Amino acid sequence: MCPVIMGTDKHHELGVGVSAIWSPMCDRFGIDSPIFGFAHDIETVAAITNAGGFGVYGATRRFPEEITQELAQIRSLVGNRPFGVDLVLPPGMPEHNSREAIQAEIPQEHTEFVQQLVERFEVPKASKPGMRTRFIRSKEIEQAQLRAVMESDVDMLACGIGAPADVVAQAKDRGKTTLALIGSPHHVPKAVAAGVEIIVAQGYDAGAHTGPIGTYSLVPQIVDAAGDIPVLAAGGVATGRHIAAALAMGAQGVWLGTAWLLSKEHQGDMHRVNRDKLIQAGSADTVITRSESGKPFRQVRTGWSQAWEAEGAPAPLKMPYQDVLVGDLLGAIEEHDIEPLIHSGAGQSIAYFNDVKPVAQIMQALIDETAQALHTQQQFLRL
């Protein structure tokens, strides 16, 4: 079980003399709180780190030269404080970055369905490639992205949908901590064999790519299976009560993504329609669909997910074919403000976030609430 130490602060408003939470993750990385935050924009990542957590930059959709530049930008914003980068490294991707080769294998039924959506919602053509078709997810681009990461001074490499042993070894040789996000206890032996140093147990509640097992059921199983490898809990973590529960289940910290979607720092990358939909969304307003990328992906339910769930819709293709099929359309939807189809990845914890706040304020609330929850739990002990 991960020890948690609570500090004191005369200005604390809880009335319990507590203002800090601690786990071995804090000493390992020199952070103030064991809260790891994932985001797709550099301002939010830097703000998480500067607020005493550990920011992680989602760079899967970035060109290698962009990764180099953006990691340097984050470093300039955080100084010597630690931060990480996340890449999705799924097995079975094509060798080369060839759009034509992928398009040639897409069934006509799927192409016609996408065209029907274009006509039904009167979507003009995109003026530039969409986020999912700027390049084709392939081993070629993956290797170039990894070179950019390895040549940077980023402190951690987080691997999603696979953590290849050779990549883990290379990162460790470069002095970078390695982390794998997994959604099933069955994935633990492979992660351990690959040599990862931290495991994120990501439950079904989580936004974006996620697995089939609920966080409450998943975390203790992965903690038990991981042995001495520390585990972070992810999926549905939105308040200090969730963090306290994660620590009680044996996690040494938490990994949050949805919590930052409505942060002030993130709004530069947030479409106004997405922001409004996220503010209004409850836990039941999210849905898991393969229509986004070909992998299970939790997002806010909109006309997009409903169209792919409708009778007569084709089954989404596997990654990266679904990316190529829908990528340009998804880009056009946001570019031209097609409101019924605009959507965002988000976890079930979105119900807890209904206005825009600075990252530092979100972080402090999480710390205060965790301390309060841990203090309150002591009443259930009879010594």
Q: Could you say what each language-model-derived stretch is?
A:
Residues Q103-F113, P212, S217-L232, A238-L383:
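Conserved active-site-proximal phosphate/metal-binding subdomains
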Residues C2, G7-A225:
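Active-site entrance/lid segments in N-terminal catalytic domains of soluble metabolic enzymes
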